[in-house]
Amino acid sequence: HMRNIRTLMNEAKRAGVIKESQYPFGKGLFEIKTGIGRKKGLTKKQLKAIFDYKSGNETTNRYKDLWIFIYLCNGINPTDMLKLKFSDIVDGEICFVRQKTERTTKNRKEIRATISVQMQAVIDKWGNKPLPDNYIFPYMKGNETAIEAKAITRDVVKRINKRMKLIGEELGIGNITTYTARHSYATVLKRSGVNISYISESLGHTD
């Protein structure tokens, strides 16, 4: 709920309804606590353990691979991942616009993620036939209502999180979620000394 309030306050600040001095969020002011498993990104060693992990259960391997795809595809949001089509692949790159920003022309930014060998392996193993009109992953059909699409996404995220929680416990890493993949992508780049503005751009954050 606090995140929704912050969004409204941001809008009010932008519209000039409230002054900067009246804005309640930020360092030294009110800070929104993050949930367990969201506090920090994984280390390279932990990521390697996840990448190397093999389960005897095919379902676990499938959702682990989708988690890896999220991480490698610039920490893509699951909503955007499930909407990717083969036509979004151009010259070895996946090009997409974050659903969060696609309605606002001002903030509309195309994200490009180079398809690595591991990403291609995930697509080859769990994806649809590589035809331009096909979704890369077999969850959306294309005729879903917005509510149905949201329900499908929520279900896939739930399945990924369930399997990753088990893997995290087995590897002694703790709770791992789709959010962890996105956060870890940014953290690894940051620790490697990559420019913050580049990280924001590759995640599709708006200014």
Where in this protein do the model-derived segments appear?
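Basic, Lys/Arg- and aromatic-enriched nucleic-acid-binding interface segment
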Residues: 20-78, 82
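Conserved tyrosine-mediated DNA breakage-rejoining catalytic core shared by Y-recombinases
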Residues: 26-28, 83-125
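Active-site/catalytic core of tyrosine-dependent DNA strand-transfer enzymes
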Residues: 47, 116-174
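N-terminal DNA-binding recognition helix of tyrosine site-specific recombinases/integrases
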Residues: 1-24
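A short, basic/aromatic helix-end/turn motif that makes direct DNA contacts
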Residues: 83-88, 200-207
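Short, contiguous acidic/charged loop-to-helix segments that flank catalytic cores in large enzymes
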Residues: 55-57, 99-114, 147-156, 174-177
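Hydrophobic (often cysteine-bearing) scaffold residues that line and stabilize catalytic clefts
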Residues: 1-4, 43, 62-63, 115, ...
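Short, basic (Lys/Arg/His-rich) helix/loop patches that form interaction surfaces
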Residues: 161-201, 205
